[in-house]
Amino acid sequence: MNRTACRLMVGVCLSLPGAAFASPPLPTDPRIQTGQLANGVKWVFYENANPPGKLYFMMHVRTGSLNETDEQRGLSHFLEHMAFNGTENFPPGQLIPFFESIGMKFGADLNASTSYDRTNYSLNLPTTQPEQIDKALMTLSDYAFRMLLDEKEIDEERGVILEESRSRKSASQRIREKLWPELFEGSRFAVRVPIGIEEVIAGAPRSEFVKYYRTWYRPENVTVIMAGDTKVQPILPMLEKWFGAYRSEVPAAEPLPAGLKPFDRERAIVVSDPEQTSCSVQLCNVLPGRPSAATVEQFRVELLEELATRLFMRRCDERIKKGEAAFRGAQAGVEDFFREAVMVTAAASGEPGDWNKMLEQLIIELRRACEQGFTDYELDLVKKQTLASAERGVRVEPTISSSSILKTLVASVHDGEPVLSAQQYLDLVREILPGITASEVGETFKGHFDRRTYAYVLTIPEKPGLPVPARDDVLAAARAAWARRLEQTSAQQVAATLPPVNGTGRIVDAVTEEQFGVTSAWLENGIRVHHRYMDYKKDQVLVRINFAGGGIEETADNLGVTSVASLVFTAPATSQLSSTAIRDLRAGVNISVGGGMADDETFSVRLGGSPNDLEFGLHLAHTLMTDGRIEETVFKNWRISTLRSLEKRERDVGAHAADALAELISGGDPRRRTVRKEEVERLTLEQGQAWFERICRQAPAEVAIVGDISWEQVRPLVERYLGTLPTRPRSAGHLDELRTLRRKSGPLVANLTVNTLTPAAVAYAGFIGCEGRHVDDRRALQIAESIISTRLIKRVREELALVYSISASNSAAWIYRDAGLFRAGSKCKPENAELVAQEVHAILRDFAETGPTAEELDNARKQILNRLDVGIREPDYWLGFLEHLDLHGRSLSEITSQRDHYERLTAADVQAAFRKYYVPARMFTVTAVPAEASAVAAGGVGSVTAAASQPE
């Protein structure tokens, strides 16, 4: 639905609508190759060696749910499922096993999606071998033209899609179903949600599938998009072989419009739901549509629109941080809808009782921007950031991934807009940006937002003691805000700088492991530093400054205090600089600085961006670590947001199931459960501030720096900005006594009923897995995870149609002793929750008894090694390993031993490791189901029970 003004390979494009002007056309990246077969099938190719030796495909079919008739509502999405359930060259049950046999994983490497006006099929090949490319193109062409649509397979898939529909049910879904038909009255868009309606999913005859398929899956609607490490010339004959011969047998049909009409009057819409906890006010307006952006002039128009909405949101953000706003969040946007309309929106969210204030303040801010415009100071800050992002785009483009390129190309194909190279984009920005004035930006904003044909939409909880306002009251409040006298204001200019860092620290010991390219050093203040140079991603550096402690140190008396301490990074401020001042200081800087509670044992400061700006990032991080402050407004908003989140969890079966599982495997340790309402209410800003200062000043620290910067370049920065932090212990031994959980012996069982309107349950089953330090067991269980996931999909999803999505997950324990988690589960029908858990245990039990087959082991090994081949090249991979290298007592040899170890693992090894952990004392089962109507009326939330019987 969004359209990108100028598609860029670097992800720094502008998402804005466009219009056609008599202006030079936008350029196109010359590296993109395109063509068309005689029957109308189009292709797009981009040669790219990141990752090396891989080739990624996306087939774009220009049709979606908008083209469905009343009898076909949901069949565009249903068809996408059927592509995996039988084609001419892959009879039912053969497609997924084949691709798994060459190292691909269903979901990650083989997938599809359906929207209102498009259907996309993705296929990521692990190699560029001609035979694999040929199979990929055969598969995609089968999707396009040769689905079998076997009646038996259709009937078996109905249950899966009904469960997919169930998995999406929520308060938000119910609000959408009430709101859209009225907000977008008379449109097809409002009544053509891709998931469809249950009557059609459950009962549509095969003839309707065939009718939709043959009408819309036709050559002129198909584009094959490719990005990867090969040449296009050898691929073209294969494209012709598989795609070129097909001719549609039915006449072409005109695509059906979304039917969106420009709004022509003011109105108010109020939508409520008993399980909605937050409140939002929205100003929505639909304006006439515009063609795809294709000219330099339209690029300029869209750049103006982007600057204008960003400036407006900066103002709202400033009001929030100063405590002047009733809302906790606000945004504005200009968005294209299917080339038929332009949606203009402004929205704010906050407390239900403040809806009137939020609406008034949002309108006042809109009026201020429309009537008074923006200042040169404000615009200069946003211009700096825009230019800096464009300049960095040129530096990162050479190593952008093929998957990112593919997404950009698909969006371009769909929207009919050119793809600019990073340099082309930068050239345009440099040419246009200096001539844009604050007055012009203000007029652009006014042209979109100063219109009185808004729909004022209020979404609000429906609960005792909270009156739901009448529509007339909302409309009257909006009109009063438009009529209110507007005071003249101006943006404050804050001339701020970061305080100087006095002195410098010293590295007292540094060792380079040449085999791994890793340098590990000690600063004289006790901070450990690991560095690895990598230019796999150009102009990127990632930094983690990890302080040992935080959540693991909390007690029943201060639960949640680490989350409060994390607020220093939500809106960075110091004793001398407000969060707004620091925000302005960061304009034009291509590095992010954030942080907070990373996990129970780590409080982290996180940096990421351009090495050119690393010194600024470390300087800011040093300033926050030594003088960071939690602003009062930030704390108040956190408390309210957290309480609303807890309120929402009360009616969420998934949240109840997760909490119950955490309680079972931890023995009820309060550190492992969700914080409670009364605990949030007693936490203070002062507690969080003191906790933050203690951690930053005293906790052992381990730092990882990975990216396109050498040790020689980074060393002086480390000594200056990390070496001048307070001295601390080298070891985190003080945490050892906190790592033990007092779990009861199993089997552990929790069966809950939850007071909710959503007709869905959750079932989990599994066992306590291994600790991370047990490398052999950890890798054997990773193999088991992959194999069991495939078995679960085949049995629980495909054969029994009990769930939409299910897989196994193996998480080794690094923080708490003997607390690894191997589990599987899913949402399902309430009456099927127990059966889902039983089926999971049956598969786990069978695996323990018989182990993997030779074929399963070979497939799982290939999949893991394929992911490893891609992942080990990424800076993120090395950062994740190095940031806890000492804390977890790990060895760099783990990395080099992985491939050989996985290749040596036998079926007996995997089975033996699995049997070690899948024993009654370590098993668990959790179900959470909606309460009966009587329980709901009584307001009960049900109970948790423990049992000591062997799961079925």
Regions found by a protein language model. Name each.
Residues 1-7:
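Positively charged n-region of N-terminal signal peptides that target proteins for export
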Residues 7-19:
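Bacterial N-terminal signal peptides
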Residues 21-45, 223, 231-303, 309-317, ...:
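Proteolytic maturation boundary segments
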Residues 46-47, 51-78, 93-142, 173-199, ...:
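M16 family metallopeptidases and their MPP-like homologs
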Residues 82-90:
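Metal-associated gating/positioning segment near the N- to mid-region
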Residues 150, 248-253, 371-379, 631, ...:
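Flexible helix-coil linker/hinge segments at domain or subdomain boundaries
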Residues 153-166, 171-219, 225-227, 232-239, ...:
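Hydrophobic, small-residue-rich alpha-helical packing segments that form membrane-like cores
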Residues 355-357, 448-450, 694-697, 917:
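Edge/loop elements at the starts and ends of beta-strands within beta-rich repeat scaffolds
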